[in-house]
Amino acid sequence: MQDSVSSKPKLLVVEDDYENQKFLQIFLKRKFDLEICDSAETFYEKLDQSKFDIILMDISLRGKKDGLQLTRELRATEEYKNLPIVGLSAHAFQKDKDNAYSAGVDVFLTKPVQNDVLMDTLVKTLEEKSGIKA
């Protein structure tokens, strides 16, 4: 849902670490109109308030629901079943990747991730899944 005022695609960053939030906000705003949330509660508030073109999901989100659960819930709805989701986690074991893909992420990245890899992955996933160029 690219904003008509801003020609940038809308990205929702789901990340509970404050330092990571700040970095991602500075780095990703070059190509995306982004909003950040830090919990399942604020995640659903953001979804109610705006339409997003892509989500960057912290798989290890702390709280009542982690990023895997949020991804499963999105995939179970008609409205969000095809929304591009890039999963991000510090856990790099094969079972972690398998769990993320089973939940419904389109791409799984391991923290720390190189800046250019993160940006390229978001741009490529958005274009491949939605036909939207960042």
Regions found by a protein language model. Name each.
Residues D66-K81:
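Short amphipathic alpha-helix used as the core "switch/output" element in two-component signaling
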Residues K81-A92, V105:
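A short, hydrophobic beta-strand element within the central beta-sheet of small alpha/beta folds
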Residues D17-I36, A40:
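Two-component/phosphorelay signaling modules centered on CheY-like receiver
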